Amino acid sequence: MEPGPSARRYDGPFALIDGGLVKAAAFGEQMLDSSVSTARFGLLVSRDKWKVVYADSFEPGEGYPRHAIDGDPETFWHTNWSGSKEPQPHEIQIDLGLKFELSGFTYLGRQNQVNGRIRDYEFYASSDGKDWGEPLVKGRFDNNTSLQRVSFDKPVVCRYIRLVSLSEVTGAYYTSLAEIDIVATKRLED
């Protein structure tokens, strides 16, 4: 239904568990009608079944790989920096627990400082966690604390995801990641 005076009136937050398209506009007796705004939302995905299956290194005591999927933007995965100085690239692989059709992913860099924020990256998807093929997307993240969304040219079906850091924003050898999430359009298994 198109927004209009007879459409359902917004009266508070509502669940959009399966994602969808939301159209909104403002109407009133003593105001001009607004233009229609449209936003598409992905499937709401629980991380209960997610697990990190591989990270090439981590900093003991603060940079555990599980922090990249714990939903807390203040925690982070950080590759080892106090012992060895393993150079880029660095990577993390995640089992989503179920197959999904993905249209993209989101990245949240470290919030409390710049150290380890990813600059150049590659993102892969796999059905079995072994055959990764070519990257779905290669790109460069902005050096900030904002959530960054990356969309794919076409949807992909997978159960495993892999983020590879090719470089760090200051040129350092280590990597950090506050949160990674998926933009799913379909849940294919339960």
Question: Model-predicted segments: where are they?
Answer:
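Short, surface-exposed tryptophan/glycine-enriched loops
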Residues: 146-160
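Disordered, acidic Ser/Thr/Pro-rich linker "stalks" and the adjacent N-terminal cap
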Residues: 37-99, 110-117, 131, 140-146, ...
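Short beta-strand-plus-loop segments that form exposed binding edges in beta-rich domains
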Residues: 164-171
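Surface-exposed loop/edge segments in extracytoplasmic proteins
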Residues: 2-7, 130-137
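Low-complexity, disordered linker/stalk regions enriched in Pro/Thr/Ser/Gly
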Residues: 1-56, 61-64
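Short beta-strand elements bearing conserved aromatic residues within extracellular beta-rich modules
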Residues: 121-123
